[in-house]
Amino acid sequence: LFSRVALSFGENGKFSHLPNDQRWARVKAGESDPGLDALFFQYARYLLISSSRPNSPLPVALQGFFNDNLACHMGWTNDYHLDINTEQNYWIANVGNLPECHLPLFDYIKDLSVHGSKIAQDLYGCKGWTAHTTSNPWGYAAVSGSILWGLFPTASSWITSHVWTQYEYTQDKNFLKETAYPLLKSNAEFLLDYMVTDPRNNYLSLIHISEPTRPY
């Protein structure tokens, strides 16, 4: 898997004799080091390869599996944050030519959509499925935490965009039929039920949501 991709900006080895902390300090000071960019690209691929493979029981979480109980004492307890963190873990999957490393995330989204269908109906009276800012290994899909950042029913749409990205890169028609389209269709049904028509312009608009990063 790792050998599938080579990335060079022409000067990859120019500063390779330096420790990485010194290279990083040079870049922060305004110096150029294209090789460090290539190194970080490959490091991201390495992290995903080492933590997310076909048949992995779960996708990559905030801290990974090896926390020595530390995660239990953190505010986010090594969960799944669907507002950006989980997505960021998988941004490298397709651009890094690692489509099979994406698969544990899709298995998780399918499970999440089952729980999210009940939340869509019970909480919003809507068809389809939804999920909010935080989730866990059991597919938790309801609102949690502060309403300032927890009431984010479009988190499901954000995480589901990954199935479309996978299809765009792979053009796998069977994946589109069996996995991507059902998830996208059901989530779109939720959005169509959830949105309201703005009388000022007749556009469909979202009812109040709390976008988690807005306060920052």
Indicate residue ranges for each PLM-predicted region.
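Aromatic-rich carbohydrate-recognition surfaces in CAZymes
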Residues: 75-196
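Acidic/polar, glycine-enriched structural segments that form the non-catalytic walls/loops
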Residues: 1-79, 98-119
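Single conserved hydrophobic/aromatic residue that forms the stacking wall/gate
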Residues: 207-216
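An acidic- and aromatic-residue-enriched active-site/binding cleft used to recognize and process polar
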Residues: 45, 49-53, 63-67, 71, ...
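Flexible glycine/proline-rich, aromatic-decorated loop/lid segments
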Residues: 198-206
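Extracellular/periplasmic catalytic domains that process cell-envelope and extracellular macromolecules
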Residues: 40, 82, 199
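Short, well-ordered loop/turn elements at secondary-structure boundaries
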Residues: 42-43, 146, 200
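Short clusters of hydrophobic/aromatic residues that line enzyme substrate/ligand-binding pockets
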Residues: 66, 131, 206
